[in-house]
C-alpha cells in the first residue's frame, strides 16, 4: 500500500482500538482523525451513514464497520493471520466477534460506559447511578456467564491471538473507565483470558493511549499522538456540533 491508511475515530472507542490493533499487528501504517462519532461533520456522515466509528480509508476502499474492516485487513495484508484456518473455526470466530460487537457492546459500552462517561461529558446530563447499578446487577452477569463458557483455560481461543480475542477484550477497559463498581471475580476464566489479551504489547499500548486521551485536551492531541508514534490526519472531520446517529441509544 503506497499511502498511509486513515482511521477516523478516537481510541477511546473499543471498535477503533480493535481496528488499530489489527493494523499494528499486521504492520499497516496509518494516520488517525480521533473524533468521537457524535462529533462528525456532514462529510463524516457521508462516509459513515450510521455515524459510527471507525471508518477506514485506504488506497482501495472506504469502510465504516469494525468487523468488515478487520476482515478486509486480514485478507489483504496476509500474515500474521488473525482468523483461524478451517471454515468451522472461522465461523466460530465471526460469531464471537459478533457477540462482542453487539451484546458486549450493548451492555458495556451503550448501557454502562455511555451512561457513565459520554452522557455527562458530551450531553451534559447527570450520571444515573441507579440505572448503571441495575445494568451491572441484571444484565452484565448474563454476558459474563456466556464468556465463561468460551474462555480458554490458557492462551487464546484458537491457539494464536485472533480478532475474536481482541474483539472481546477491548470492551473491558471501557468497563473499568466507567467506574461502575462491577465485581468480575465470579468469572475467573474470562478475567484471565482478557488479562492475557490486554497484556499483548499492541493492546497494552492502545489501552494506555486511550486512557490518556480521556483527559487530553484537543489542543494537546498532537503531542500525545506524536508520543505514541501515530500521525494525525491533515484535516479532521470533526464538526462544531454534537449530534446523534440514527442508531444511537
Protein language model regions, located:
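Sequence-pattern detector for short linear motifs
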Residues: 20-21, 55, 196-199, 224
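GST-like fold's C-terminal all-alpha helical module
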Residues: 100-199, 205, 249
Amino acid at each position: 500500500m503506497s499511502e498511509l491508511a486513515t482511521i477516523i475515530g478516537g481510541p477511546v472507542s473499543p471498535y477503533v482500538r480493535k481496528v488499530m490493533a489489527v493494523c499494528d499487528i499486521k504492520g499497516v501504517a496509518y494516520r488517525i482523525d480521533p473524533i468521537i462519532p457524535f462529533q462528525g461533520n456532514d462529510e463524516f456522515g457521508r462516509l459513515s451513514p450510521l455515524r459510527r466509528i471507525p471508518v477506514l480509508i485506504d488506497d482501495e476502499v472506504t469502510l465504516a464497520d469494525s468487523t468488515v474492516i478487520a476482515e478486509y485487513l486480514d485478507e489483504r495484508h496476509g500474515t500474521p493471520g488473525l482468523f483461524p484456518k478451517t471454515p468451522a473455526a472461522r465461523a466460530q470466530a465471526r460469531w464471537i466477534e459478533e457477540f462482542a460487537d453487539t451484546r458486549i457492546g450493548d451492555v458495556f459500552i451503550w448501557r454502562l460506559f455511555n451512561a457513565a462517561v459520554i452522557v455527562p461529558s458530551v450531553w451534559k446530563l447527570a450520571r444515573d447511578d441507579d440505572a448503571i447499578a441495575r445494568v451491572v446487577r441484571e444484565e452484565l452477569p448474563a454476558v459474563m456467564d456466556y464468556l465463561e463458557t468460551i474462555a480458554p483455560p490458557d492462551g487464546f481461543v484458537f491457539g494464536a491471538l485472533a480478532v475474536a480475542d481482541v474483539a472481546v477484550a477491548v470492551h473491558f477497559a471501557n468497563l473499568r473507565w466507567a467506574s461502575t463498581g462491577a465485581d468480575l471475580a465470579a468469572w475467573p476464566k474470562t478475567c484471565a483470558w482478557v488479562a492475557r489479551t490486554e497484556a499483548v504489547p499492541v493492546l497494552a499500548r492502545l489501552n494506555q493511549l486511550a486512557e490518556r486521551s480521556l483527559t487530553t485536551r484537543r489542543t494537546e492531541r498532537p503531542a500525545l499522538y506524536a508520543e505514541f508514534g501515530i500521525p494525525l490526519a491533515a484535516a479532521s472531520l470533526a464538526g462544531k456540533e454534537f449530534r446523534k446517529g440514527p442508531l444511537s441509544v
